[in-house]
Amino acid sequence: MIDIKAQYDIPTMRRIQNIHFIGIGGVGMCGIAEVLHNQGYQVSGSDLKASSTTDRLEELGIKIYLGHLEENVYNAHVIVVSTAINEQNPEIIWGKEHRIPIVRRAEMLAELMRYRHGIAVAGTHGKTTTTSLMASILAATGEAPTFVIGGRLTSAGANAQLGSSAYLVAEADESDASFLHLQPQTVIVTNIDEDHMDTYDGDFEKVKHTFIEFVHNLPFYGLAVLCVDDENVREILPTLSRPVLTYGIDQEADFYATEIVQTGRYCEFLAHRPEGEPLKIRLPMPGRHNVLNALATIAVATDLGVDASAIQAGLMGFEGVGRRFQEQKPLALPNGSNVMFVDDYGHHPSEVLATIKAIRAGWPEKRLVMVYQPHRYTRTRDLYEDFVRVLSQVDVLLLLDVYSAGEAPINGADSRSLCGSIRQRGNVDPIHVGSEADLRSILSNVLREGDLLITQGAGDIGMVSKNLSVSGI
């Protein structure tokens, strides 16, 4: 077993010193850039426009270029790109012409993992929260792990940190299958669901086979921690030839939860382990889906030999992660009263449903008012009926226009079509919202004392939420 208090000296990447990131403001890029900067590399990056992320990186001493120009990479020894970057980008073109190595972000993440005990968290849903919980538990041992997370960890004020221990905890991104570049020693698979189907030619069997390949990237002495409550994870389980521990509400799992009680945003439960007394857990996050996320980290921590007290403290002391059921200050209404206000990143029907269930369990007396922004026309098209079914379960629904993420509009996969289909279902009469100004006006008429307002989605609705929190309605 690796000593979790070991001070790790990481070998350098030999002749590589200057590392340039194209699209450095992206959530998957900025964290890797920050860790490399803190390791002593000369890091630079370019993006189309300034953001709070690029501003923060600049404050750390990372050179930021606004716009993509070939001169940005004249001094680069390696160029890091995400799949969102077009091959016609002038920085990529110049790099190829001058034989500069161009690597995907997952390849660079794999390099960060190479000399550490990598813990990679995969799954269609719950990656960011589970990765954050894992980092919190390891930090509770007294030695900070390195982590790269797809959201801002409240306790650290960042989505990445260079730690002092042997461990690196990171999300493993299946959206472009780039997680196959990673070679961790421990993996978590939270679930497998239909999403990013364009990557897999619309074939869900390919999705499942890719997860199997990901698990088999483990060394023979590695460990896969899998959620058996998920039917697709259960399906791949017999095909795996690596050591496995399972978790779930299902009591046939190696690690399972009983006596689950949710009060407001807190969940309490007993975590049963193969050996030893059950752990009494108090988790400051609502919903059974977060109980599952916590169980995954309990399984990994137990395997690593983390003390029960550190597991309990790491979970109880978890301060949350940005846009994952993030409570804002109460929103003031024109009549002087206020409503509970939450912002959440979930943008897949399964994620939205989990959030709705968590709210119903924790605040059953409140009327649920959701402002939802669909993310991508392809996702809206592919999961259209699921969106109709799930969004019909709120009390008041306001639908913003689809956040395209660069996609061309698809007929019948827009917000007005979604409104019509939800209205036909008969449970709720949705309101289409054309602008942020319209949203403020509608909310001032719709909201009433005792409501719970949630802004939901992965596009720029996070900024809408921030503006509402700052300026009110």
UniProtKB/Swiss-Prot annotation:
GO molecular function: ATP binding; UDP-N-acetylmuramate-L-alanine ligase activity
List of residues binding ATP: G123, T124, H125, G126, K127, T128, T129
Transmembrane stretches, start-end: none
Entry EC number(s): 6.3.2.8
Top-level class of the enzyme under EC nomenclature: ligase
GO biological process, one term: peptidoglycan biosynthetic process
Name of protein: UDP-N-acetylmuramate--L-alanine ligase
Origin species: Marinomonas sp. (strain MWYL1)
